[in-house]
């Protein structure tokens, strides 16, 4: 997956779709009560990016629905996965609970709406395992509003770069043992040299353990240099989050990588393990 980073308005979304990205990451902000508000990152953000792009969440979800509904004039076949990077900083337990509930409501009302034909997969990406109440509330609300079958299109991710054994225990408490993406990364402003790759290697090794259920895919973020992308591919990542989707796709298409990998399409289930 070539995951376009920080896709927070319609113009940049179109630009990344034209580049060929098959996934996007969108930042979702919340009010202090936990109400989903808009697609917005704000400052600081990645180097060489404009941090203040924004659009209201209802309009954004409706637009995504158009882009991912076959037969719609705006349909873009290449958009498979949407990573919702949830900005939950400082929310109380009650606000986290409300946030999960309200995000489920908004997906039902503005993305799937009446016919449920919009086909993108969503990754509900929570910053910290201590904010797991959001996931619990989100899953419960989908069932209560009779959208439980859409759970087939929902995955989960914690992005705190913590020890995954602890993350697994949180998933066990939540009753989640599938549709799990794991990630490792750092802002593009800091060289990968300072971050290192040991945790990324550990996640990939854990994913590949026979019978292991708690990691379906591993992605790295935010990789904008050829050396970093090439290293990630050599390690066996399933996705690269980047500010330059066409650049990553170009590297993927080089003979040394295309013999093993190709860009994922809608026919490739993002919750199934890939076996080379």
Curated annotation (Swiss-Prot):
Family: Belongs to the arthropod phospholipase D family. Class II subfamily.
EC number: 4.6.1.-
Record text on cofactor binding: Binds 1 Mg(2+) ion per subunit.
Function: Dermonecrotic toxins cleave the phosphodiester linkage between the phosphate and headgroup of certain phospholipids (sphingolipid and lysolipid substrates), forming an alcohol (often choline) and a cyclic phosphate. This toxin acts on sphingomyelin (SM). It may also act on ceramide phosphoethanolamine (CPE), lysophosphatidylcholine (LPC) and lysophosphatidylethanolamine (LPE), but not on lysophosphatidylserine (LPS), and lysophosphatidylglycerol (LPG). It acts by transphosphatidylation, releasing exclusively cyclic phosphate products as second products.
GO biological process, one term: killing of cells of another organism
Swiss-Prot/TrEMBL keywords: Cytolysis, Dermonecrotic toxin, Disulfide bond, Hemolysis, Lipid degradation, Lipid metabolism, Lyase, Magnesium, Metal-binding, Secreted, Toxin
Name of this chain's protein: Dermonecrotic toxin LafSicTox-betaIE2
Superkingdom in the source lineage: Eukaryota
Tissues expressing this chain: Expressed by the venom gland.
Entries under InterPro entries matching the protein: PLC-like_Pdiesterase_TIM-brl
Cysteines paired by S-S bonds: 45-51, 47-189
Catalytic activity, reaction form: an N-(acyl)-sphingosylphosphocholine = an N-(acyl)-sphingosyl-1,3-cyclic phosphate + choline; an N-(acyl)-sphingosylphosphoethanolamine = an N-(acyl)-sphingosyl-1,3-cyclic phosphate + ethanolamine; a 1-acyl-sn-glycero-3-phosphocholine = a 1-acyl-sn-glycero-2,3-cyclic phosphate + choline; a 1-acyl-sn-glycero-3-phosphoethanolamine = a 1-acyl-sn-glycero-2,3-cyclic phosphate + ethanolamine
Essential cofactor(s): Mg(2+)
UniProt enzyme class: lyase
Catalytic residues, chain numbering: 5, 41
GO molecular function: lyase activity; metal ion binding; phosphoric diester hydrolase activity; toxin activity
Keyword Lyase among record annotations: yes
Residues annotated for Mg(2+) binding in this entry: 25, 27, 85
Localisation: Secreted
GO cellular component terms, A-Z: extracellular region
């Amino acid at each position: 997956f070539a995951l376009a980073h920080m896709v927070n308005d319609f113009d940049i979304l179109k630009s990344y779709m034209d580049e060929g990205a098959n996934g996007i990451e969108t930042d979702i902000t919340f009010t202090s009560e936990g109400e989903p508000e808009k697609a917005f990152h704000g400052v600081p953000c990645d180097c060489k990016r404009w941090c203040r792009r924004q659009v209201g969440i209802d309009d954004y979800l409706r637009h995504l629905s158009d882009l991912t509904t076959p037969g719609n004039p705006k349909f873009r076949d290449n958009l498979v996965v949407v990573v919702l990077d949830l900005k939950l900083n400082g929310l109380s337990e009650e606000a986290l609970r409300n946030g999960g509930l309200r995000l489920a409501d908004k997906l039902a009302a503005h993305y799937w709406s009446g016919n449920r034909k919009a086909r993108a997969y969503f990754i509900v990406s929570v910053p910290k395992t201590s904010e797991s109440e959001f996931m619990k509330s989100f899953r419960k609300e989908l069932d209560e509003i009779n959208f439980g079958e859409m759970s087939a299109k929902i995955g989960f991710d914690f992005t705190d770069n913590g020890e995954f054994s602890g993350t697994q225990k949180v998933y066990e408490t939540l009753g989640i043992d599938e549709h799990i993406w794991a990630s490792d990364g750092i802002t593009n402003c800091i060289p990968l040299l300072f971050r290192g790759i040991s945790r990324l290697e550990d996640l990939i090794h854990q994913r590949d353990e026979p019978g292991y259920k708690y990691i379906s895919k591993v992605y790295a973020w935010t990789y904008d240099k050829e050396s970093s992308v090439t290293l990630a591919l050599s390690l066996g990542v399933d996705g690269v989050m980047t500010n330059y989707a066409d650049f990553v796709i170009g590297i993927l298409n080089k003979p040394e990588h295309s013999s093993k990998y190709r860009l994922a399409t809608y026919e490739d289930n993002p919750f199934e393990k890939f076996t080379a």
